[in-house]
């Protein structure tokens, strides 16, 4: 609460999950899938203890997804369907989750770097006009990650469900000219895993079984340190084969797919995406920075988001960065490599890092009026109120 007794809400709207709670807390109150579903056919009114409604959101929609036509309002960090997004926010602020009177609350929202200004304008408009929050702030996700890690300078590799971005932050300022975005993230890896399992002969439906395959991915996938060696193991032995029991009782065996699916992060061509993978993108980003700041960046690489949770990802990233540095900067001089200092921070709670940073920031700033865009300012200026955050509104 701020000094006037208003609740300060923090809402990290991800492409795949909404993480919401209050300023100052060290864990989200609620984490639920960012999906909206509508029944394909209305035959039953109840499944178990869940009543089937014309519109199902979040946890309930996820449980009954096989009977629903499911939509994700966000794709690659950008809101694609505003009506569904509002349903998601109604659910977040309503009795099912936070149960707040939005008129007496302030809210801190998050967004990926390089998001279109139009997206941010619309968010602010909805927050003030539909929900009438007393104060709103929109923060860049990468900066919040560093706050949660107690840093002001570093490079954040944030990979969630919809988008991966590499965002250098120097002395508390994100550097948009150096920020790189890769539209490969958790959802694409799940899709690729479905494709690989179909090739193995298992029958999966792209939409109905999506969540099931996502769970297989989270339980069994990892990033290979040495890809040739992993492929050899997959072909010649059964060391990598693991069994997984599906919700309907079927048992499937997953082998080489365990490392092949996340490999798309490092080799985008596997899923027909042009461009370099996450390791080379990170290297290019740091090398494009001012020469005086590079060593600071190499020493403070922070992983964030659910798609950085694969076992083996930090060590593979480090290996590829060293290799690229050796080839392109040291021109193959192995002797000098010992002077190259690199540190990848992989905090155990990195899945919720953005929320944690938001909760810290909102708590520090809860009584600072010049930090928040207020409802009164919005009534006077409209979306131009965003200029307070340093956004140019044309």
Swiss-Prot record:
Keyword Metal-binding in annotation: no
Domain of life of the source: Eukaryota
PROSITE patterns cross-referenced by the UniProt entry: ACTINS_ACT_LIKE (PS01132)
Modification sites for N-acetylmethionine: 1
Compartment annotation: Cytoplasm, Cytoskeleton; Cell projection; Nucleus
Protein known as: Actin-related protein 2
Amino-acid positions noted as binding ATP in the UniProt annotation, renumbered to this chain: 160-162, 214-218, 305-310
UniProt xrefs under InterPro entries: Actin, Actin/actin-like_CS, ATPase_NBD
Xref: Pfam families: Actin (PF00022)
GO molecular function terms listed in the Swiss-Prot or TrEMBL record: actin binding; ATP binding
Protein's job: ATP-binding component of the Arp2/3 complex, a multiprotein complex that mediates actin polymerization upon stimulation by nucleation-promoting factor (NPF). The Arp2/3 complex mediates the formation of branched actin networks in the cytoplasm, providing the force for cell motility. Seems to contact the pointed end of the daughter actin filament. In podocytes, required for the formation of lamellipodia downstream of AVIL and PLCE1 regulation.
Gene for this chain: ACTR2
Organism this protein belongs to: Pongo abelii (Sumatran orangutan)
Any GO BP: positive regulation of double-strand break repair via homologous recombination
Keyword Acetylation among record annotations: yes
Residues where N6-acetyllysine is found: 299, 322
Similarity annotation: Belongs to the actin family. ARP2 subfamily.
Record's keyword terms, sorted: Acetylation, Actin-binding, ATP-binding, Cell projection, Cytoplasm, Cytoskeleton, Nucleotide-binding, Nucleus
An annotated GO cellular component: nucleus
Subunit structure: Component of the Arp2/3 complex composed of ACTR2/ARP2, ACTR3/ARP3, ARPC1B/p41-ARC, ARPC2/p34-ARC, ARPC3/p21-ARC, ARPC4/p20-ARC and ARPC5/p16-ARC. Interacts with AVIL.
SUPFAM superfamilies in the cross-refs: Actin-like ATPase domain
């Amino acid at each position: 609460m701020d000094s006037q007794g208003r609740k300060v809400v923090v809402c990290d709207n991800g492409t795949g999950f909404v993480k919401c709670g209050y300023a100052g807390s060290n864990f989200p109150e609620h984490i639920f899938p960012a999906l909206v579903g509508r029944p394909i056919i209305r035959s039953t009114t109840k499944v178990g203890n869940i009543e089937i409604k014309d519109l199902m959101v979040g946890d309930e929609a996820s449980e009954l997804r096989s009977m629903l036509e499911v939509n994700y309002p966000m794709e690659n960090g950008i809101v694609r369907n505003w009506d569904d997004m509002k349903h998601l926010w109604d659910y977040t602020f309503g009795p099912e989750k936070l149960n707040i009177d939005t008129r007496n609350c302030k809210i801190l929202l998050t967004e990926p770097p390089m998001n279109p200004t139009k997206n941010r304008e619309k968010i602010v408009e909805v927050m003030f006009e539909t929900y009438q929050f007393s104060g709103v702030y929109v923060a860049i996700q990468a900066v919040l990650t560093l706050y949660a890690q107690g840093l002001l300078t570093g490079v954040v590799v944030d990979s969630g469900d919809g988008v991966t971005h590499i965002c250098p932050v120097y002395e508390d300022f994100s550097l948009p000219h150096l920020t790189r975005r890769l539209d490969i993230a958790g959802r694409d890896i799940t899709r690729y895993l479905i494709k690989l399992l179909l090739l193995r002969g298992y029958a999966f439906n792209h939409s109905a079984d999506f969540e099931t395959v996502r769970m297989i991915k989270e339980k069994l996938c990892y990033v290979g340190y040495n890809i040739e060696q992993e492929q050899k193991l997959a072909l010649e032995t059964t060391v990598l084969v693991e069994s997984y029991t599906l919700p309907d009782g079927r048992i499937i065996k997953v082998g080489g797919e365990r490392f092949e699916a996340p490999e798309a992060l490092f080799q985008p061509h596997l899923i027909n995406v042009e461009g370099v993978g996450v390791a080379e993108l990170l290297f290019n980003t740091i090398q494009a920075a001012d020469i005086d700041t590079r060593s600071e960046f190499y020493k403070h690489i922070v992983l964030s988001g659910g798609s950085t949770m694969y076992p083996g990802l930090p060590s593979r990233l480090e290996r590829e960065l060293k290799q690229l540095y050796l080839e392109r900067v040291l021109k193959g001089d192995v002797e000098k490599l010992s002077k190259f200092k690199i540190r990848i921070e992989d905090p155990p709670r990195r899945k919720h890092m953005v929320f944690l940073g938001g909760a810290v920031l909102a708590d520090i700033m809860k009584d600072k009026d010049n930090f928040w865009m207020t409802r009164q300012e919005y009534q006077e200026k409209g979306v131009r109120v965003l200029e307070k955050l340093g956004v140019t509104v044309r």
